[in-house]
Amino acid sequence: MSNIEPDERGLLLACPHCGKRNRLKYEGLGRTFRCAQCKNELPSPREPIDLKSDLVFDALTSRSALPVLVDFWASWCGPCKMVAPEIVKVASESAGGLVVAKVNTEELPSLARRFRVTAIPTMVLFKRGIEVARQAGAMPAPGIRKFVASVP
């Protein structure tokens, strides 16, 4: 899915200019980062971040300087497959203002239980680790953007 690898300290992103892997700390998301090697500006994440552990989920949602939209999904879910390209559009269009992440509920059922996700897809918006809104069901990209924008 991604050339971005999240861990508990931040996002590992390869520089598009020289290939050097750089760490973008969650606390600094939304500001400008420069490559440690070539000093060129690094792009903001423009694709959904695939979260693979509770620890990384907690680090991203609690420390991100930007709001984090999390898509809870499953591989067997038809509506989840339909909304996946819409999530990619939102991530690309919202780069620098919103972090978009995905949680496969089959791989991380503990997170689905913890956040009482009973229908999928479910999108949950977090600000500084606090759930501020949620929406169940598939939506096109404009509907997702409207959902995010409706939260103060």
Regions found by a protein language model. Give the residues of each.
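Short pre-active-site segment immediately N-terminal to redox-active cysteine/selenocysteine motifs
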Residues: 65-66, 72-76, 119
